[in-house]
Design a protein with these regions (language model features):
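Short acidic low-complexity segments
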Residues: 21-31
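Charged, amphipathic alpha-helical segments and their flanking helix caps
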Residues: 1-21, 42-150
């Protein structure tokens, strides 16, 4: 969920005022919005304390239509170029900090990005593959003090 929220934050910060839906699109959604969800993912254990997540996210942008219910293609091209700039040219994506943990800034490597524009649907379908290495959370060991040092 941390990486999904991070992808949504990157999109929301560049498309101010455009809704970003996670997991499902509401029945009464209005066009001019994003829908982001995890399509596939794998996790690989690197060693005893580190693992690597390799999620693939689907980003769908539903473009606005005019009064005649026709797609405004120019807006689709602008969104397509902005998404490409966000997820290709930067090569890394900032990751939100884990809940309740103070840590330095973390980044996920962008492995690949592809998109398909469907003018007939008035939508852009993009796939984003990430690579993120994370420490395995360890349980705090409970112990008693042997005594006070004088």
């Amino acid at each position: 969920m941390r990486l999904l929220n991070s992808v949504c934050k990157v999109i929301a910060s560049s498309f101010t005022g455009v809704p970003v839906h996670i997991e499902e699109v509401p029945d009464d959604f209005e066009r001019g919005c994003f829908y982001v969800f995890l399509t596939t993912g794998s996790t690989e254990l690197k060693n005893f304390v580190t693992y690597q997540d390799n999620p693939i996210f689907q980003i769908v942008y539903f473009g606005e239509r005019n009064e005649a219910d026709q797609v405004i293609a120019e807006n689709l091209y602008e969104v397509k170029e902005t998404l490409k700039r966000l997820f290709v040219l930067s090569m890394v994506m900032p990751v939100l900090p884990a809940e309740g943990v103070t840590e330095k800034s973390r980044y996920a490597k962008i492995e690949s990005y592809s998109d398909e524009m469907r003018i007939s649907e008035g939508a852009i379908y993009a796939r984003l593959a990430l690579n993120f290495t994370e420490d395995i959370p360890s349980a705090q060991e409970e112990y008693e003090l042997m005594g006070d040092v004088d």
